[in-house]
Amino acid sequence: RGYAGRVAGGVFKPGDEVTVLPSGFSTRVKAIHSPDGELSEAFAPQSVCLTLTDEIDISRGDTLVKANNPPMVNQNIEAMICWFSPRPMLRSTKWIVRHTMRETQAIIKEVKYHVDINTLHKIEGVDDFHMNDIGRITLRTAVPLIYDSYRRNRTTGSLILIDPHTHETVAAGMIV
């Protein structure tokens, strides 16, 4: 049985020990396949099909990671966001967070600060966001996210916030 997906970072080779997150099951890569045939390695941003040495349950949105290079797994996520929506942010809203292939609900637990785009100074004590505001927040997600900082990996370190009523993208974020 093969598992198809896109490599977000690093290099995978047959024989590599990998861990499935969030389950924590470990196995080894048996073979790597692409539309062009079998590969000796896979790297970002290739789309590949991995066969593993053990039959384990892997679901859509699960993440395969090298055993010696685990990402962070947490429900409290700090991010720098840019607010896109003409409607202001309401702290009481349960937003939809889209991160890699997963979606979950989240609340904005804390607004740490805004950034004055003219001076790049931090403005503390602001509790909401309006169109084009940039700032740092803490999100609390319904389920843990598997992520890296944006500086380390742009794919696993980015997210978007979606309005649960209109399904409009209201903000984009870089995990810090």
For every predicted segment, state its role:
Residues 2-176:
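C-terminal effector/interaction modules appended to NTPase cores
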